[in-house]
Amino acid sequence: MPLYKVAGAAAAAGKSLEEVAAIAQKFADNMATIAVATKGATHPATGMEIAHIAEGTMEVGMGQHGEGGGGTQPMKSADETAAIMMDALLKDLNVKAGEKLMVVINGSGATTLMEQLIVFRACHKLLAEKGIEVVASAVGEILTVQETAGFQMFIARMDDELLGYWNAPCRTPYYRN
C-alpha cells in the first residue's frame, strides 16, 4: 500500500508515466516488509481455515493470506516480536544509524488498534536506540485478512522526495492522511 500511495502522489503531482515508474521503483528498492500471525485466515466463502497456527505459537514471515513463511515459533511478547521482525527488516535493507525510515504497522484484521500501537511503540524505541529516525508512520488496518490475528510491519528508507509524496494529501475509501 505505501508504494501505491507514493506512486499515486507522484502521478497527481503531474509526473510522467516514466517518472512515476522511476519513483515507484526507487521506493520499492528501499522498502521491506514482514508479517506475523497468531491465528490463521479463513476462506470468505466457506469459512474454512486456510492456515492453522497452533495455540501458543506464532508464524513469522507468513504471507498476506496466511501462507507459511519464516517458520513457527513459541509466542513472544509484543516487544520481543517487534524486535525479531524489525531486526530482520533492518538487515534486509542494510539500514544504518543516521538514516530516516517510514514505519507502517498494518493490523491483519483481528488485532486491536491498541495492540498495533504497542508494537509501533516498541519499533520506535528500538529504532531510536539504534540512531535511526522515524520520519513517517501509519498504524491501523489498511489491508486485512479475514479473521487473522497478527500484523504486517513495513519499513522504507525515506529521502525528501519520497517523504513529500508520502505526506501529500490522500483521500480514498481505505486510506486517508
Feature annotation, model-predicted:
Residues 29-41, 70, 134, 166, ...:
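Generic preference for hydrophobic/aromatic residues in regular secondary structure cores
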Residues 3-6, 10, 85, 89, ...:
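Buried hydrophobic packing segments
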Residues 48-81, 85-118:
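Glycine-rich phosphate/diphosphate-binding loops and the adjacent beta-loop-alpha structural elements
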Residues 88-177:
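C-terminal non-catalytic interaction/assembly regions of soluble proteins
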Residues 3-5, 40-48, 57-69, 118-131, ...:
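Short, Lys/Arg-enriched charge-dense amphipathic segments
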Residues 1-65:
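Internal, active-site/partner-interface "lid" segment
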Residues 1-2, 15-26, 55, 76-84, ...:
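Conserved active-site and cofactor/substrate-binding residues in soluble primary-metabolism enzymes
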Residues 12-22, 53-64, 71-82, 132-146, ...:
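Hydrophobic transmembrane alpha-helix bundles
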